[in-house]
Amino acid sequence: MQRNPGVVAARKHWEALERVPIQMRTLPDPQIQVQEFTVGSPKPAAGYETSNFYYTGFGISQEIPGPGKLRLQGDIAEQDAEIARHQYKAAQREAAEKIRESYFELFYLTKTIGLLESERSDLLRIEEIAKARYRVGEGQAQDVLKAQLQATRMLNEIVHHHREMQQRQADLKAALGRDLDSPDIVIGAVEPTRVELDRAQLGEAVRRQSTELMIDRAAEERSEKALELAQKGYFPDFTLGYAYDKTGPGFRDYYMLTLGAKIPLYFWRKQTPAIEQAALERSAAREQVRAHELDAGASAEDQLVAIHASDRMLKIYAQGLIPQAENSIQAALAAYRVSKVDFQTVISAFVDLLNLREEYYRTLADHELAVARLEQIVGEVK
């Protein structure tokens, strides 16, 4: 998963933003000045020996933001990095969910293809029984044709699933950051993941572990710092300077210390609206936290309901429906051999068993997909 391009990009973005706070807490670069003041002529050194107004000067000045501004700028940058860190976690979870989605779809397709190939062999044996009965005058040609038609349908489904498997393999390789021409990924066995969470535990997990909420809370904290910084806009910024001016021979040198201040003279048009803007953005960030908490809770609840429902369905398939369907096909075959039921009954029993087995694997895959979607919201739940 660490080779997934989206995950790599999110990590690099986070690492880049971690370099910003120290920059924002650092004073602006000082300015160095070199100047020459001539007298009576623009020519260099004019008045050097005749006027005490001539000088060649060297100076340095430093901008100093108002008290607390640099600290708050650094705090805001830290929150930007924190947001990026949670976005990196979210990218990891999203990539994991996509990987698992493709994997479990491949699992379903692999199992279904194996099932279709196995059941097609059983169908060919049923077809042979129908042919044998037809040869001795106890069956109909229509029975053989029905078996052949069902076998063709199954073959068509196998071809369709193979085509879909190729697409899913491509999706899985892309999610893993592998080349498309790399070897296909082997699909192993899958067992239902046990999820033992009640609604209270689920709500707590959402509040503590949802990456979307972590992003929103970091954004809310950022908006708090941005409001504090906006309020600091009423305080002036300063410029401190020092200069040394060398005069001609016989005259005294000059030494100059300066202190300047940037006054927020038009505060009602700049600083006050900026504070109002920051306050509104803080309110929006708070509401966003609440909105995402409700959305994440509802989504997690939906997935938990789906998990519990599929748990029950898997037990019903494994312990009830499939064994009953297996008994039904055996009974139908036995009755068909002695002409107690028609061939349509046998085909119907065969198709019922095939569909139930396919539905079992579909339910198992959907169960694991729901677990993957839940873990995208709240992290690991095993």
Regions of interest found by a model, annotated:
Residues M1-E36, K43, E49, Y54, ...:
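Bacterial Sec-pathway N-terminal export signals of envelope proteins
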Residues V7-M24, A91, A95-L116, R125, ...:
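Amphipathic alpha-helical coiled-coil segments
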Residues D29, A96, R199, F235, ...:
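ATP/adenylate-binding site constellation spanning eukaryotic-like Ser/Thr protein kinases
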Residues P30-A90, M214-H292:
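Small/polar-residue-enriched beta-strand and adjacent coil segments characteristic
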Residues G74-E78, A141-L149, F343-V351:
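Short, charged, amphipathic alpha-helical segments
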Residues Y88-R207, Q303-A306, S310:
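Periplasmic alpha-helical coiled-coil/stalk elements that build and connect Gram-negative outer-membrane
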Residues G137, G177-R178, S339, V378-E380:
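Short helix-capping/hinge motifs at transmembrane helix termini and TM-loop junctions
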Residues H161, T211, T363:
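Metallo-beta-lactamase
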